[in-house]
Curated annotation (Swiss-Prot):
It is an enzyme of class 3 (hydrolase). Its EC number is 3.6.1.41. Pfam families: Metallophos (PF00149). Keywords: Hydrolase. This is Bis(5'-nucleosyl)-tetraphosphatase, symmetrical. PANTHER family: CYTOCHROME C5, PTHR40942. It comes from Histophilus somni (strain 2336). The keyword Hydrolase applies.
Amino acid sequence: MATYLVGDLQGCYDELQLLLETVQFNPVQDKLYLVGDLVARGDKSLECLRFVKSLGAAAQMVLGNHDLHLISTALGIKKVSLQDHVEAIFTAPDFVELIDWLRHQPLLVHDEKCDFVMSHAGISPDWDLDTAKSCAREVENELQHGDYHYLISNMYDNQPDRWSADLQGLQRLRYSINVFTRMRFCYRDHRLDFACKASVEKAPQELIPWFNLDNPLFKVQNLVFGHWASLVDTPTPANIYALDTGCVWGNRMTMLRWEDKQYFVQGALKDYF
């Protein structure tokens, strides 16, 4: 049995399949973890959704910002982004089933046996693990059981940009969604920045990668995330695993076998733009 973790798919279905062939993935005995953003700019988002769903218990994903945006467009709240290639999803006979399955996926996964925590974008520098798990469950409960139309309609905002235990209701949920699915850089006072998507080397000096801020959790816990393609080839602390290496941007898709920490890569098969 082996545990594999893979970076953002973004509709790059063929590259995923080649990686799974390379590692001889066996869904009967192996487990595949996905850091989110199954859909968006690649041309096989529908295939990615169907495949991951078909794996059942052999796969575990977390929701990314593009996955949430797909739910939003499915509800008619937002329009499909011009760069996204998700049209086939909306005309698929299993469209409703796929969207319902997607909104039942978590924002955070803690595999205690393998000793890693996975989310799409990261963990707030102001959270310990219990707080992170609690905040994730609060959002998941709304998406899965509550008035998720209201939540999805009101999640598009950059405020609040700083954590407080006193946050309640929509403010608290929105902060959590932004941390789990959108965060990259923070200021020294832990305020979230959403403007900069650059590499660490090219970012303004006042911005700090979230995982380099002072949080005891970041020093002891294995953290796995995607979302940040411009981090490719940028060193991170030994316990921080950044798996989005920009396949949809013409770079490569990266898969990590957890047991021996061996990486497998597959270059982009085409220019998606």
